[in-house]
C-alpha cells in the first residue's frame, strides 16, 4: 500500500517566529495542510500577491489553490472571529467552502469564555499571565473538565446545549465578582458565526486525514505559538493552554507518531516574546529597541510590542530535543544586517553561581552567558544564493549549526516569499 508522509512545521521559541511565510514556501510540496492546536490568540502573517493577511484559525495553505486545509480537533474555534477571517479571504477571491474542512471534535470558544478569561486575569492582580483575552484558557479548561462544546454539537439541539453552558459560565463569572461585561452584541455575531460554520465541511478529521495518508498523499501539520509556551514544557505558568510541541500534532489531528517524518523547526536569528514571563536574553536598551523597530516586532493579533533579545541557544537546543527537529529554518536574518556585534547565549549562570547548558526548571533569575560574533554589516535582502552570504554571517550560521547539532536548511532575508534562501 502506498503511504503518504506527515511532516510537522512549528516554531522553536516563544511564538511569532515567522511560521506563516515558511508554510507558504513549503506548501507546494504537500497535498493537505492541517492546523493541530491553538486558537485565534496567535496570528500568522502572510503576504500573497502583494497583499498582507493575518490568519488566526485558518491554516496557511489556504492560498495554494486545490489543496485541502484542515482545522484539527486540537484547535479551539471562535465562530465570530473565524467568520470574519474567512469572509476577508473570500472578499479577496479565495474560495474556502470546498477546501477548508473543520473537525467535529474542535472545541468552540463561547462569548462567556472571553468574559471568564478577563475575570480570571483580573482576579490575579499583580500575578497576571498576560493572556490575549480571547478565551483560549477557559475553553481548554472546559475541554479538560469534559464540559466543553464542540463543533459537532452545532449539528443538533445546539441552542439548548449552548444555554446550559452559558448559564454555568455566568455563575463562575458572578463568583469571581466580575461585572464589567455585556455579551449581547458579541453573542449575536457569535451565533451568525455558528450558522456560517455549517456551510463548511464538518468532518471526522482523524478519519479523513488517515484516509488521505493511505491514498499516498502528503500532509504538512502546522502548529501555532512555540514550545516555550507549551503547557507542559514551556515557561509555566506563563504559557498557553495547549501542547504546542510536535507531539501535539498526533494529539490534535489523530495521527500515529510513526507517521511523523521531517520536523521543521523555525527560529528567528534573534528572539522575541509577547506577554509576561521569564526571558533570559531580553534586551532593555537601545539594541533591543533597534531589533524591535527593524523587525517590526508587534503582535499580529494584539498589536502589543514584542520583547526582544539575542538568540538563546540553550533554549533552542531544548526545543530541538523535545520536538525531534530534523531541519532548522532561520527567519529575519536581515534584521541583524547593521549590528556591529551579534551575540548568542551559550549557557546560563544560575542563582547559586553554577553554569548550565540545560534549560532549568526555573528560568526566572538566570543570567545569560554570551558568545560574541562580528556583525556582517551587509544588506542581504537582495541575495539569491547562500554563496553571497558574507563571511561573518556564515560564521554565525556555522556556529549555530554546530551548537544545535541540526542543519539550517532555509534562511529568510526579508518578508517577501522570494527573499528565502534554500541552502544546499
Q: What annotation goes with each model-predicted range?
A:
Residues 1-424:
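Non-transmembrane, aqueous-exposed alpha-helical and coiled segments at domain scale
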Amino acid at each position: 500500500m502506498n503511504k503518504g508522509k506527515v511532516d510537522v512545521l512549528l516554531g522553536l521559541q516563544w511564538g511569532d517566529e515567522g511560521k506563516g511565510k515558511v508554510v507558504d514556501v513549503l506548501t507546494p510540496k504537500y497535498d493537505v495542510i492541517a492546523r493541530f492546536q491553538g486558537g485565534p490568540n496567535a496570528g500568522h502573517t502572510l503576504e500573497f500577491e502583494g497583499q498582507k493577511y493575518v490568519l488566526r484559525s485558518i491554516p496557511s495553505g489556504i492560498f495554494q489553490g486545490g489543496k485541502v486545509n484542515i482545522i484539527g480537533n486540537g484547535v479551539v474555534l471562535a465562530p465570530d472571529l473565524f467568520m470574519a477571517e474567512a469572509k476577508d479571504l473570500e472578499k479577496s477571491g479565495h474560495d474556502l467552502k470546498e477546501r477548508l474542512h473543520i473537525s467535529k471534535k474542535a472545541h468552540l470558544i463561547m462569548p462567556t469564555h472571553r468574559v471568564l478569561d478577563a475575570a480570571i486575569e483580573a482576579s490575579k492582580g499583580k500575578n497576571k499571565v498576560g493572556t490575549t483575552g480571547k478565551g483560549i484558557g477557559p475553553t481548554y479548561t472546559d475541554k479538560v473538565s469534559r464540559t466543553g462544546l464542540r463543533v459537532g454539537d452545532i449539528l443538533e439541539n445546539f441552542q439548548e446545549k449552548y444555554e446550559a453552558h452559558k448559564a454555568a459560565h455566568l455563575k463562575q463569572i458572578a463568583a469571581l465578582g466580575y461585572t464589567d461585561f455585556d455579551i449581547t452584541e458579541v453573542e449575536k455575531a457569535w451565533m451568525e458565526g455558528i450558522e456560517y460554520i455549517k456551510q463548511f465541511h464538518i468532518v471526522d478529521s482523524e478519519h479523513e486525514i488517515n484516509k488521505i495518508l493511505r491514498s499516498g498523499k502528503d500532509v504538512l501539520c502546522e502548529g501555532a505559538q512555540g514550545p516555550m509556551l507549551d503547557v507542559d514544557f514551556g515557561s509555566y505558568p506563563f504559557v498557553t493552554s495547549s501542547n504546542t510541541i510536535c507531539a501535539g500534532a498526533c494529539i490534535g489531528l489523530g495521527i500515529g507518531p510513526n507517521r511523523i517524518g521531517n520536523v521543521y523547526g523555525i527560529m528567528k536569528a534573534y528572539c522575541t516574546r509577547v506577554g509576561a514571563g521569564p526571558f533570559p536574553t531580553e534586551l532593555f536598551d537601545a539594541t533591543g529597541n533597534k531589533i524591535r523597530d527593524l523587525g517590526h516586532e508587534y503582535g499580529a493579533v494584539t498589536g502589543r510590542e514584542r520583547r526582544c533579545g539575542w538568540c538563546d541557544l540553550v533554549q533552542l537546543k531544548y526545543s530541538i530535543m523535545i520536538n525531534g527537529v530534523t531541519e532548522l529554518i532561520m527567519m529575519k536574518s536581515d534584521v541583524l544586517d547593521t549590528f556591529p556585534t551579534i551575540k548568542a547565549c551559550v549557557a546560563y549562570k544560575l542563582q547559586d553561581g553554577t553554569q548550565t547548558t540545560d534549560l532549568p526548571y526555573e528560568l526566572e533569575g538566570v543570567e545569560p552567558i554570551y558568545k560574541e560574533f562580528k556583525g556582517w554589516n551587509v544588506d542581504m535582502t537582495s541575495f539569491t544564493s547562500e554563496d553571497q552570504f558574507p563571511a561573518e554571517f556564515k560564521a554565525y550560521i556555522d556556529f549555530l549549526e554546530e551548537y544545535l547539532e541540526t542543519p539550517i536548511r532555509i534562511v529568510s532575508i526579508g518578508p517577501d516569499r522570494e527573499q528565502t534562501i534554500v541552502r544546499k
